[in-house]
Amino acid sequence: QCKGRPVPQLEDVTEKAGIRFRHIANPLSTYIVESMSGGVILWDYDRDGWLDIYFTNAPTIEMALRKESARGALYHNNHNGTFSDATDKSGLATPCFAMGGAVADYNNDGWPDLYLTCLGGNILFRNNGDGTFTDVTAKADVADGRMSVGAAFGDYDRDGFVDLMVANYVDFQLDHLPPFGGKSLCKYRGIDVYCGPRGLRGAGDSLFHNNGDSTFTDVSKAAGVDDPHGYFGLGVVWADFNNTGWPDIYVANDTLPNFLYRNDGKGKFTEIGLESGTALSETGSEQASMGVALGDYLHNGRPSIYVTNFSDDYSDLYRNDGNWMFSDVSYASGVALPSFPLVKWGDAFVDLDNDGWLDLVAVSGHVYPQMEKVPASAGYAQPKLLHLNQKDGTFCDAGNLAGPALEEKRVSRGLAVGD
């Protein structure tokens, strides 16, 4: 634990801020897709200098079979600590079976646009600059159509237009639903739970090249990032990991090795996850890889990688040592043990105490509601994690020292940080 240093105090101001959004969830989590949604995005969609909020939402499978949708929510920042619901005006109310999303100005008109990852077809919303958005998915040709979870924009060919990388999870069809429980891969600690991802077919990933005319071309296979074996992709980030001037790609895969794609500067990527030390744990184990964040926590000019994982496993901190080499310093840095009992999801590097050094925060929540019946488990709702940077390559655990907001147990998925 952190001792002899001030710890930032975090307060839950949701009610004071006027945020009334509630995420829909099946209390039984009968299918794997019902445990996945819950993304959140901080972005200044109207360019007034204040961060606004978008929450993704998804229906239960029972609702989806009845063609019912779930209402997402856009909250406009009022500049006084409160927010106003701008969902109806914006046109972002009920877009899809939404998981997460990404923001970028894809058409270089100066306004940030919104891309949502969904089950059965993603959506690209063009920002019209007047508080409204237009669905341009068909024109842009970026629907994908599989179960997408993670997405990120990056200009891999440095032509001045952002491209789009999408991580896809499992092949999940509403007209061919997997059973609940029964099989060995559909049990956890002897209890029947939903099936997956093991036992289900994975889905490949997509890289869409921005053509500069508001359309995209799928170059996944040509670029070497299509994941032909169909791993269970969850998160994706872009970064110039070796300071070559070209953005590389990291994909976090559930229960399978992660990918690190090195950009060769000629439109192609080489997968070097195993060689770089970022594919597996320190002991060579495949992990759940449920959240991924980047940050130069050492001030060495190189982005390191933080990956959150399932319970009874630790979160990985891959220290970037340069020359495409990373070291798993999770235990040495102090971030491993506090994370072990929790099912970790969204994570971020953020300087919470304004000391100039990046700290680590992560949210947690089990995927199986049935865990409430297991006395030895951490339960379904779980607390958050906070690791403060000690400026020497290590972190101290401040999760239970930063106020009740972090200690309060919730079933969390997405995380976004901002002022």
Model-derived features: where do they sit?
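Acidic, glycine/proline-rich Ca2+-coordinating loop motifs
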Residues: Q1-D419
